[in-house]
Amino acid sequence: SSTWGAAVALPDIEITEEDEEELKQLAVKCEEIGAEIDSVTNRKNNSKNVSELVYKLSMQLGLAPGIAMLNFCAAMIYDAGFLALDSELINATTLTDEQKQEMKTHVELAEKHLDFVPKKYWNIFEDAAMKHHENMDGTGYPKGLKGDEIPQIARLIRVAESYVSLSSKRN
């Protein structure tokens, strides 16, 4: 099976002209939340950089522009769960094992920050937020998904986030 998800079901979403304005408004809201996430996590432009890379990867994979835009929006707020965690925990230089486990809860905590997402796009955003720490070999969290069990958006964010992290200075 394909690493990039030929075997994975793509979002069954048709983006119409009427949806374009809604997508623009969604992008603006996601950019606002992304900036807030970056402020809380002390990662300057992380959301912007990850989402732009996800968009470029989506287009390179031949996804429809509307789906690429949805992926961009979802990637902007994939770490929304950090908004529910204490900033001292997020910015600690060292973490105890217990604190590491608490940090991992950001994937489940994201859900409460996605209430503005239109229902028809919900699954993409939920997959982005809750599954971006899953690994192809099953060693990720929170569910230990592997291979084709991991949605395409989560794979794209995993790759983009890793690249951005490796190529950026932490503030």
Segments (PLM) and residue ranges:
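Histidine- and acidic-residue-rich, metal-dependent catalytic cores
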Residues: 3-4, 9-171
